Amino acid sequence: MVLCFPLLLLLLVLWGQVCPLHAIPKHLTRAQWFEIQHIRPSPLQCNRAMSHINNYTQHCKPQNTFLHDSFQNVAAVCDLLSITCKNGLHNCHQSLKPVNMTDCRLTSGKYPQCRYSAAAQYKLFIVACDPPQKGDPPYKLVPVHLDSIL
């Protein structure tokens, strides 16, 4: 039994080093974190925009897509027909029309000096949606994950 505790502690420490890569900052809801990561009404400079995200996670995120639309318009996609997400859940929704977006990809650097390339796109998207949490806008469903770009 005494041997199990140090092993469990080691596993928790190792898990904690991996988990923050996908963890949502504690003071944000999933929808708020989605908005920070993926909603920018106008085109942007990837190095600056990604710096804001990377400051939350303390690492260089390898890739990120920003939708150039409002949170309200993206949330409206949650009212469309549900489809199956990449993870097998049935809470995804596809946009009916393409939107402008910027795809940012890590090219070099280590946090906090992350460098990104930018690619402008005009495509459809699929978002996962969930009921709002306390602090979210009062929609029936809110976007919480950018599942796919088509």
UniProtKB/Swiss-Prot annotation:
The gene designation is RNASE6
According to UniProt, residues marked as the site described as Critical for catalytic activity are 61
Per the annotation, which location comes first and is thus the protein's main one?
Answer: secreted
Q: Which GO terms describe its biological process?
A: antibacterial humoral response; antimicrobial humoral immune response mediated by antimicrobial peptide; defense response to Gram-negative bacterium; defense response to Gram-positive bacterium; innate immune response
Highest rank taxon of the organism: Eukaryota
Disulfide cysteine pairs (residue numbers): 46-104, 60-114, 78-129, 85-92
PROSITE patterns recorded: RNASE_PANCREATIC
Q: Which organism is it from?
A: Saguinus oedipus (Cotton-top tamarin)
Compartments annotated for it: namely:
Secreted; Lysosome; Cytoplasmic granule
Q: What is this protein called?
A: Ribonuclease K6
